[in-house]
């Protein structure tokens, strides 16, 4: 039972701890926004190209015109919703990523169950493995979605009149389901590990270890961003008097305590700008 719980925990947190996963959430949303920015137009363009090909006599795709047109319009709508809403509300991007995945799976299910040829069935198998790799999400949610989609495929497959005699879709989709879950876990674990490492590096770079204030590097970068964007702001310099005397008289530990106390006072006083307090020198704050 302990092994099962450990396995579930690994799938739930992609090999991270619960605390590390919580820290990764904002970055995960950024990665999904960045991914949807190119995935949706790429899918739309691919479907439009397939629709154009289906209009060519003798292409073998003439009967699929309506299918390609429908899903091209669907991707265009999702792309438009992304541009209008989700780019401004990245905290909800997970909704769009799953809508996109369901759309891709619906396309694959139709190909596998209604067109009834090996090539079309292969499309679904490829989607089952590849689609979860396009987003960043916890492996357990992707695995559950993959299993549900496989169940839907098999249900539709038999409803439309196929039988167990044609086992290409059944056997291959089940194999790809397992492969997709395993590959999804490995890839998502790597993605989350990279995100965690990026956060650690960024925190060490942008945070003063002694006080917890933002660092001089962060100050220079943030000031440059504000200048480039034409943002006006006031800058208050605070210099801690008596630091050298405290170091010489009571030792560096006392001096460090003085610096930390100064930061605490600034942090408590500037409640609305506590994220904009920087330590730019030994005894200098901004």
Please identify what each model-predicted range represents.
Residues 1-23:
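Non-catalytic regulatory/interaction regions at protein termini and inter-domain linkers
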Residues 215-234, 241-271, 278-282, 286:
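Conserved long alpha-helical elements within nucleotide-processing catalytic cores of c-di-GMP signaling
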Residues 142-154:
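Central hydrophobic cores of alpha-helical transmembrane segments
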Residues 165-174:
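Loop-to-transmembrane alpha-helix initiation sites
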Residues 42-130, 151:
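Hydrophobic transmembrane alpha-helices and their membrane-interface boundaries in multi-pass
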Residues 87-91, 133-145:
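Membrane-helix interface "capping/anchor" motifs
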Residues 196-214, 246:
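Amphipathic HAMP/coiled-coil signal-transducing linker helices
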Residues 175-204:
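Juxtamembrane or sensor-core-proximal signal-transducing alpha helices
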């Amino acid at each position: 039972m302990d092994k099962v719980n450990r396995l579930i925990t690994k799938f739930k947190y992609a090999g991270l701890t619960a605390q590390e996963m919580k820290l990764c959430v904002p970055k995960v949303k950024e990665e999904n926004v960045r991914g949807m920015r190119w995935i949706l137009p790429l899918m739309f363009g691919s479907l439009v190209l397939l629709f154009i090909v289906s209009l060519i006599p003798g292409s073998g795709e003439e009967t699929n015109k309506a299918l390609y047109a429908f899903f091209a319009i669907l991707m265009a709508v999702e792309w438009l919703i992304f541009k209008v809403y989700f780019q401004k509300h990245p905290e909800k991007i997970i909704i769009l990523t799953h809508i996109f995945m369901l759309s891709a799976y619906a396309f694959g299910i139709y190909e596998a169950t209604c067109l009834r040829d090996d090539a079309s069935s292969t499309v679904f198998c490829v989607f089952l493995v590849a689609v979860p790799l396009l987003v960043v999400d916890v492996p357990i949610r992707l695995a559950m979605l993959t299993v549900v989609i496989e169940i839907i495929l098999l249900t539709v497959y038999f409803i439309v009149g196929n039988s167990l005699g044609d086992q290409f879709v059944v056997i291959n989709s089940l194999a790809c389901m397992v492969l997709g879950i395993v590959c999804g876990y490995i890839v998502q674990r790597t993605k989350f590990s990279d995100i965690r490492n990026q956060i650690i590096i960024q925190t060490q770079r942008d945070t003063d270890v002694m006080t917890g204030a933002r660092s001089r590097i962060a100050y220079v970068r943030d000031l440059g961003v504000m200048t480039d964007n034409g943002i006006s702001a006031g800058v208050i310099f605070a210099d801690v008097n008596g630091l050298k005397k405290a170091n010489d008289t009571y030792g560096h530990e006392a001096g460090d305590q003085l610096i930390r106390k100064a930061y605490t006072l600034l942090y408590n006083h500037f409640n609305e700008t506590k994220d904009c307090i920087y330590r730019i020198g030994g005894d200098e704050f901004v």
